[in-house]
């Protein structure tokens, strides 16, 4: 089991990062908030979770052990796999997720694409007591987000639809964000759009 990876950041994409450690490039799927803390060419440490399937081995990277442990905890809920768990952490930061579960806030959980009312209720019932067993841990201080290699609009819309938001809804949210922040880079625009979409659901 690979518990963490430390090394130079070779590539930052919309949903993953490549970190070179001991001459090996590791591809780690990550949330927008985690990717926003990384800088290409700088050294980074990410805590990891590995999902092994018959035909694949996938690494997921997190800024701290709290997010990694919550990722694992989410998957103990029936019907929640790695992709949906990552979508939850993309929309709700660890603190917000803890609060939503503790307060049985079904509405907050249904902001996540792919989670309906029943799924959110099941998540609350199964995790409300367990979530307090995951230690709270602050992540490392963030650094300057990477500069987008392609137009911001194209990248952000692709990322949002990849998380499960409808294309039209993603475009409308991004238009609102860019109207208010025309100079926003990809990471900033993506996080703002996610926040807006979460409020509107």
UniProtKB/Swiss-Prot annotation:
Residues 153-201 are annotated as: Domain III. One of its GO terms (cellular component) is Holliday junction helicase complex. Keywords: Cytoplasm, DNA damage, DNA recombination, DNA repair, DNA-binding. InterPro entries: DNA_helicase_Holl-junc_RuvA_I (IPR013849), Hlx-hairpin-Hlx_DNA-bd_motif (IPR003583), NA-bd_OB-fold (IPR012340), RuvA (IPR000085), RuvA_2-like (IPR010994), RuvA_C (IPR011114), RuvA_C_sf (IPR036267). It is found in: Cytoplasm. Residues 143-153 are annotated as: Flexible linker. CDD domains: UBA_RuvA_C (cd14332). Pfam families: HHH_5, RuvA_C, RuvA_N. One of its GO terms (molecular function) is ATP binding. It comes from the Bacteria. Residues 64-142 are annotated as: Domain II. Residues 1-63 are annotated as: Domain I. GO terms for biological process: DNA recombination; DNA repair. Its main location: cytoplasm. Homotetramer. Forms an RuvA(8)-RuvB(12)-Holliday junction (HJ) complex. HJ DNA is sandwiched between 2 RuvA tetramers; dsDNA enters through RuvA and exits via RuvB. An RuvB hexamer assembles on each DNA strand where it exits the tetramer. Each RuvB hexamer is contacted by two RuvA subunits (via domain III) on 2 adjacent RuvB subunits; this complex drives branch migration. In the full resolvosome a probable DNA-RuvA(4)-RuvB(12)-RuvC(2) complex forms which resolves the HJ. The RuvA-RuvB-RuvC complex processes Holliday junction (HJ) DNA during genetic recombination and DNA repair, while the RuvA-RuvB complex plays an important role in the rescue of blocked DNA replication forks via replication fork reversal (RFR). RuvA specifically binds to HJ cruciform DNA, conferring on it an open structure. The RuvB hexamer acts as an ATP-dependent pump, pulling dsDNA into and through the RuvAB complex. HJ branch migration allows RuvC to scan DNA until it finds its consensus sequence, where it cleaves and resolves the cruciform DNA. Has three domains with a flexible linker between the domains II and III and assumes an 'L' shape. Domain III is highly mobile and contacts RuvB. Belongs to the RuvA family. This is Holliday junction branch migration complex subunit RuvA. The lineage of its organism: Bacteria, Bacillati, Actinomycetota, Actinomycetes, Mycobacteriales.
């Amino acid at each position: 089991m690979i518990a963490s990876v430390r090394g130079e950041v070779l590539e930052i994409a919309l949903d993953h990062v490549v970190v070179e450690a001991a001459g090996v490039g590791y591809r780690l799927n990550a949330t927008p908030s985690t990717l926003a803390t990384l800088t290409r060419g700088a050294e980074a440490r990410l805590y990891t979770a590995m999902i092994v399937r018959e035909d694949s081995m996938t690494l997921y990277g997190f800024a701290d052990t709290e997010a990694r442990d919550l990722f694992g905890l989410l998957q103990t809920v029936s019907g929640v796999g790695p992709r949906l768990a990552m979508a939850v952490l993309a929309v709700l930061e660890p603190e917000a997720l803890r609060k939503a579960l503790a307060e049985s806030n079904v509405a907050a959980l249904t902001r996540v694409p792919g989670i309906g009312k029943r799924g959110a209720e099941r998540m609350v019932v199964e995790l409300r007591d367990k979530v307090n067993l995951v230690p709270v841990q602050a992540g490392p201080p963030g650094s300057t987000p990477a500069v987008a290699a392609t137009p911001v609009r194209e990248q952000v819309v692709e990322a949002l639809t990849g998380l499960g938001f409808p294309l039209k809804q993603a475009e409308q949210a991004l238009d609102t964000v860019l109207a208010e922040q025309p100079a926003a880079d990809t990471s900033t625009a993506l996080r703002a759009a996610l926040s807006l979409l979460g409020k509107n659901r």
